């Protein structure tokens, strides 16, 4: 009797192991491989991370923010993860948290000094991190706030830089989701193209 029970348990264990291995193969190999191949065939740029290249050099992904510290470039919004794509996330600090207030105040003072503006003129997206910490966009207002600095650093006329900003304003997704926005990397690369053609 005991041997029959033992045999039945062993059979069930073997069946469970076979089912697990089959599902692992189907979900981990067949499904993943199929989706990867389809993605590469139908959406080759997106499947490879939407990386923007200039002169065969990868400049970054259009969907991942990166820090810009040169005054000749538009700056991205703050990142709670120091722009690390492997550690996406917000700061999780509550609005009542003193650490959040201190960080926002420090960022505000830095922007006021850098852009020669008042605190009330600073758009909120230049003070607040995004949910993922890697939002590659800023608002049109945040871009326009930086125009004077960028124009001066590049020795360009402000109207020329404003026109460039206007060209890179993206509408809300499908016209209804989100707000108008400017991709910082694309805008900065366009600035570099202007400088390249001016030489």
Swiss-Prot record:
Bilayer topology term: Single-pass membrane protein
Chief subcellular location: membrane
Coiled coil: none
Transmembrane regions: 21-43
Single annotated GO MF: ATP binding
Keyword Chloroplast: no
Places the protein is found: Cell inner membrane
Xref: InterPro entries: KdpC
Keywords: ATP-binding, Cell inner membrane, Cell membrane, Ion transport, Membrane, Nucleotide-binding, Potassium, Potassium transport, Transmembrane, Transmembrane helix, Transport
GO CC list: plasma membrane
Record-linked NCBIfam families: kdpC, PRK00315.1
Function, in words: Part of the high-affinity ATP-driven potassium transport (or Kdp) system, which catalyzes the hydrolysis of ATP coupled with the electrogenic transport of potassium into the cytoplasm. This subunit acts as a catalytic chaperone that increases the ATP-binding affinity of the ATP-hydrolyzing subunit KdpB by the formation of a transient KdpB/KdpC/ATP ternary complex.
Subunit structure: The system is composed of three essential subunits: KdpA, KdpB and KdpC.
Family per similarity comment: Belongs to the KdpC family.
Name of the featured protein: Potassium-transporting ATPase KdpC subunit
Organism this protein belongs to: Shewanella putrefaciens (strain CN-32 / ATCC BAA-453)
């Amino acid at each position: 009797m005991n041997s029959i029970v033992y045999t039945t348990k062993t059979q069930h264990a073997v069946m469970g192991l076979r089912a697990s291995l089959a599902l692992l193969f189907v979900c981990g190999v067949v499904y993943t491989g199929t989706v990867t191949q389809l993605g590469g065939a139908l959406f080759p740029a997106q499947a490879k991370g939407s990386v923007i290249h200039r002169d065969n050099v990868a400049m970054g992904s259009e969907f991942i923010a990166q820090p810009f510290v040169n005054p000749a470039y538009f700056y991205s919004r703050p990142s709670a993860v120091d722009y690390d794509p492997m550690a996406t996330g917000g700061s999780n600090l509550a609005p009542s948290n003193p650490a959040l207030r201190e960080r926002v105040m420090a960022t505000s003072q830095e922007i006021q000094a850098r852009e020669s503006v008042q605190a009330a003129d600073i758009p909120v997206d230049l003070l607040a991190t995004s949910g993922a910490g890697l939002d590659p966009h800023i608002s049109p207002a945040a871009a326009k706030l930086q125009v004077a600095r960028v124009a001066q650093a590049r020795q360009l006329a402000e109207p020329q830089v404003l026109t460039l900003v206007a060209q890179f304003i993206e509408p809300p997704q499908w016209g209804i989701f989100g707000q108008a926005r400017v991709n910082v990397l694309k805008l900065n690369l366009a600035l570099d193209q202007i400088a390249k053609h001016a030489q």
